Amino acid sequence: MAAKVFESIGKFGLGLAVAGGVVNSALYNVDAGHRAVIFDRFRGVQDTVVGEGTHFLIPWVQKPIIFDCRSRPRNIPVITGSKDLQNVNITLRILFRPVTAQLPRIFTSIGEDYDERVLPSITTEILKSVVARFDAGELITQRELVSRQVSEDLTERAATFGLILDDVSLTHLTFGKEFTEAVEMKQVAQQEAERARFIVEKAEQQKKAAVISAEGDSKAAELIANSLATAGDGLIELRKLEAAEDIAYQLSRSRNITYLPSGQSVLLQLPQ
C-alpha cells in the first residue's frame, strides 16, 4: 500500500516537473529598453514587435530574438583624401539605435549584428564623399560645416537601413606627416615675418625721431644765429652773466665753500 502511495507521489512529482519545464520554456522576458522579434519555425520571422515584459511563446516552435533599442555609441576611424589630395585621418563618433517598427526587416535582411555590417561601410562612404569637397585648410577652418554636412548625409543614409542616428560628431582630425610639417613651417615663417616687420617699423620710428630731433637742433641754431646777428656781443655777455649767476648760486648752496669776490681782499664766508 505504501509503495503505491510513493509511486503515485513520484509520478505526480514527475508530471509537475515536466509541466513546470514546459511552462518555463513557454515564457521569456524582454528587459527595459529592449524589443523582441519572434522567429517561427513554420512561418518565419513575424511582423509583430514584442515590447517589454514577460510573454508566452510556443516551445520548440517559436524563438525570441532580443534587440537593444537604446542609443549606443560607436567610434569609426576612416582614412580618406581631401580635395587637394592630402591624407586625412578622421574618427567619427555615432550614437545610434534601430527603428523599433523595422526590427523584423532589419533581422531578416541584415541580422542581429546590423551595426557591424552597416555603420562602418556607410560611414566610410559618406566621409569620403564629404571630405573630398574640402581642401585640407578648409577642413580645419570650416570643421563645424564639415561635421554638419557629414551628420546630415549620414543620418539620411542610415535611415534607409532602419537606423536612427541621435548624434554624429568629428572627434579626431589629423593629416599626413608632410602636410603637418608644412603647416608648422608656415607658422614659423609667419612669426619670423611678423618679427621682421616689427623691427622695420621700430627702425622707421627711430628714423623719424632722429629727423625731428635734427630739425629741432637746426631750428634752435638758426634762432641763435639770428639773435647774435641782431644783438651782437651784448647777447653773449648777457648769457655769460646768467651762467655766472647760476654757478654762484649753486656754490652758495654747497657746504664748506668760500667765495672770493673779484677786486676785494676780504674773504667772506657765505651762509650755510
UniProtKB/Swiss-Prot annotation:
Location(s), subcellular: Mitochondrion inner membrane; Nucleus; Cytoplasm; Cell membrane
One GO cellular component, as annotated: mitochondrion
GO BP: DNA biosynthetic process; mitochondrion organization
Keyword Cell membrane: yes
InterPro entries: Band_7, Band_7/SPFH_dom_sf, Prohibitin
Keywords, ordered alphabetically: Cell membrane, Coiled coil, Cytoplasm, DNA synthesis, Membrane, Mitochondrion, Mitochondrion inner membrane, Nucleus
SUPFAM superfamilies xrefs: Band 7/SPFH domain (SSF117892)
Coiled coil ranges: 177-211
Lineage top rank: taxon: Eukaryota
Subunit structure: The mitochondrial prohibitin complex consists of two subunits (PHB1 and PHB2), assembled into a membrane-associated ring-shaped supercomplex of approximately 1 mDa.
Family membership noted in the UniProt record: Belongs to the prohibitin family.
Role noted for this protein: Protein with pleiotropic attributes mediated in a cell-compartment- and tissue-specific manner, which include the plasma membrane-associated cell signaling functions, mitochondrial chaperone, and transcriptional co-regulator of transcription factors in the nucleus.
Name this polypeptide is given: Prohibitin 1
Name of the encoding gene: PHB1
